[in-house]
C-alpha cells in the first residue's frame, strides 16, 4: 500500500505544478515564441467616445454589455486564448484546494460578492459561477472575462493575468500577452538559464573569485564570438574560421554577451571620477536622479568603444537592417504596437543609464538638415553614444530633455552657412522665432492677429489660374487719367490673394506606449496647444488602438511648421518642462511630425537618423474630392508607394476612424498607383451635413493624408471639378493654352489649401459649441470667398456668405469689419470681369436678412459699390465687349440702383458708365439702358426681337479659322482640321447646296410633266390622239 500511495502522490504533485502555469510543459525555442500571433488592439475603439475638438475620451455606457455579447458569440475564433483550466483535475479538486496554504502569495477569495451564489467580479457581469470550474469560482471571474483582452473592474479598464490570477491595469501588459509584465520578466529570466549551474555562475565575473577555470573558458568563448561577429560585419566572411572556433552568434547570443559585459564593475578610480561628473550633472537638473548609484555603475570606456564599433559596423554593413528594425519598431500590417519593449529585459536600459555621464566630442547637426546618411553621422563622439538595441534613436547631447548650455550652443540658425560654426546662445537668428524655449506673454498670439490684413494694391487676380493675366500694371495710375484712355476700366482689377499667406494643415502623431484612453489627462488639448506656443489656428484629433495613437491635425503657418521640425528636440524638452502634469514626463512616447521622428524614454529625447530612408507612401489625389453626405460612392486613390506590403488605408471623421477595403485598379500605364475604394459612405451624418474627413494611408509609422469634403449635391458637383488640378492633361494643351491657364507647379498646393480651409470651416459649423477666439477669422473667409468666385461656385458662395453673416450679424446688419472685408475683395467686380451671369445674379440679389420686411432688407453687393479709382461694376461692364447680359443684370437689381446710376455715377476721373461704353464703341449698351429708362417712364415693357440670318459662307470661314487656331495641339487634330477645311472650301459655290437641291427637284417635276403632256399616247380605238384637238366643256 505504501508503494501504491507513493505512486498516487506523484501525479498530484505534477498537477499542482501545472495549475500554477509558471513553467511550460516542455522547453520552447525562441523562434517559436516570437512567431506566436499577437492581438493588435489592447482596447476597443467602439468602447470609447472621443471628442475630436476637446481631446477628451469618455467610456460608452453600454460598452460592457456589447463587449460581452461579442465575446460570447465568437465560436472558436480565438482558440489560442483558451486556458483549459482545471481539465483533468476533477478527482483531485480537494487536494488542490488544500495545497493553497503552501502558497502564501496566492490569495484565496470568497466565492460570492454578497449574494447567495458566486458571481464574476467584473462590473455589470451577473454570470453565475456555481457550476463553473473551481478556478473561476475561487478567483471570481467567468470564463469569458478570464480570456478577454479588457474588462471594466472597479470602473477601470483592466485585464485578467493568467499567472497572477487577478486583474491588472492594461498598462501592465505588453501587446498580446496574457500575463503581466512583472510575471513575464521572471519567466524570461528562468528560461534564459542554462542547464549547468556552473555556467550560470560564470556569467558574471566577480572580482576576488579565484575559481576561474570555467570563467576563463566562457570569457574566451564570448570574446571569440564577438570577434567572429566583427569579422563578418567587416566583410571577412570568406575567411574560413579555424577549427574549434565558435560559429557566428545570432542576435540573442550577442545581446546575452553584451549583457555580461555591461555587468562588469568599473575600476575604483573611474568610479570616483563618475561620482564627480554625476554630482555636477545633477546640480543642473531640476529633478534629482532616482538612483544615483545606477548612474555611477556605467560601463568602462573599452566596453563603450566595443559597443560603438559593433553598432557602427552592424549599421553600415546592412543598410536594410535599419528599415526592417524601424518597421518592426513602429508597426506594420500585422501589428501597430511598437516592439521597443522587447528589449527592455536586455541591455538597452542599462546602456542608456550608463551613457549619461559621458560627453560627446565634435559638433552636432541640426535635426532639420537635409544631409545624406553619411553626413548625418560625421561625428565619432556621436557614434560613440550609439546603442546597439536602440540603433534607430541615436543618443546625443541634443537628445536630453532639457538642453544644457554646452549643448545649446551647437544649434545653428537657418542663416548660418557653416554647419561647424559655433554660435552663442544669445545670437539672434534671421528668421522670426515662433517657438521660444521659454513661454512668455510676448509669444502669445493676439486674438485679432488674423482678422486684420493690410489693404493691398490693385493687383491682377491670378489665383488658381484666373483669366486676369491681361491686367495692367498693379500700381494703378488711376486718379489722373485722361478721358480718352481707351481701357481705363480694365486697369482696375480686383486685388489678388496668395495662398502662401494661409495656414498649412499638417498632422502630428503621438504614439503613447503602455497607455489607454482612461489614462489621458483632461488638459491634453491645452498642453499641446501651449506646447505649440498658441500658434495653431485649428486643432483636431482622433485616437486609435496600438497603445494609444493620437493623431492631431494642426493648421499653422508654413514658417511655424518649418521651425517646429528644425527644433523638434528642443520643443519636446519644453513640453516635458512646462507640462503641468507628470503625464509626459512619465510616459514613453514617439512623435512624428511628417519629416522628423523623435522618441522619449526615461527623461531622454532622441531623434531618428534613418527616418528619411524609409519608403513612405504618398497621396497625390482622391477622386472625387467631395462626397454627398449619406450617399454611397466609389473613390479612386492615387499616389506613390501605395501597393507596398503593410499599407493600410483608413477614413477619419469626427474623432473616429474606419478601415477601408481597397482593390487594385485595372492595369494601365500610369505614373501613379491607383486604388479603388468601393461602397464608400460616411457614417452617422444626415443628408444636409457639411463637414470634412481625411483619407489616410500609412505604412508602419509613416504615411500621408488627403482632405475629403462632405456636403450637399450642388456643392459637391462644383468642388469635384477641382480634380483636374491634380492631374492636368498637359500633353493635350498648347503653349498658348498653358500660358492662359496659368497653372504652375503650385496649383496643387493652392487647391489643397483651399480644401483644408473649407474643411475647417465646415467642421466648425458642426461643432459650434467650441468657440475659440474669433472662431473663423475674416482673413480666412476672404481667401475662401475669392477662390469660390474665381471658380464660379455659386452654391458654395451662398453657403459661405450665410456662414459669414451668421458670425458677424449685429442688429440685422453686418458689422463694420465684415463690410470692409467684402469691399476689399470686390466679389461683384470679379464676377463681372469673368462674365459669370449666374454669379452676378446671385450676388446682386443676396440678402443679409431675408426674413425681414421688404422695406428693411439689406443688400450687400450693389452695382454702384466703388473700388480702387472709383471703379464700379457698371464701369467695368461698360468697357468690356460682349457684356450685354452683364449690363442687363446690373440694371435689373432689386433696388434699381444700376439703372438710375448709368448716366450719373462717376469714377475718380469723372467718367460715367455711359462714357465708358461710348469710348469703347459699345453703343448697344447705351441703347439697352435708354430703352429700359423709357419703359420705366412710360410704365411699359418692351421686348427686343432680332432676326439674324446666318451666312453659311461666313460660318464656314469662322469654323476654319477656329480649326486653324487649335490645329497645333497634336498631329491627328491637324490632319482632321486640314481635311475639314478642304471639304468646306471645295463646297463654296454661287448658290448654297440646299437651294440647288430644291431647284433640281422642281426642275425634275416640270420636265416630267412636260414630257407627259407633249407625247402621243396610244388610245384603245387605235386612232392617234392629238392634244391639239381637245376642247373644254362640262362632263
From Swiss-Prot:
ANK repeats lie at residues 780-809, 823-853, 869-899. Residues 186-213, 358-459, 473-500, 727-746 are annotated as: Disordered. Residues 384-396, 480-500, 736-745 have a biased composition (Polar residues). The keyword Transmembrane helix does not apply. It is found in: Nucleus; Cytoplasm. Disruption phenotype: Plants display elongated petioles and enhanced leaf margin serration and are able to germinate and develop in the presence of the programmed cell death (PCD)-inducing fungal toxin fumonisin B1 (FB1). One of its GO terms (biological process) is regulation of DNA-templated transcription. The SBP-type zinc finger is required for the binding to DNA. Trans-acting factor that binds specifically to the consensus nucleotide sequence 5'-TNCGTACAA-3'. May play a role in plant development. This is Squamosa promoter-binding-like protein 14.
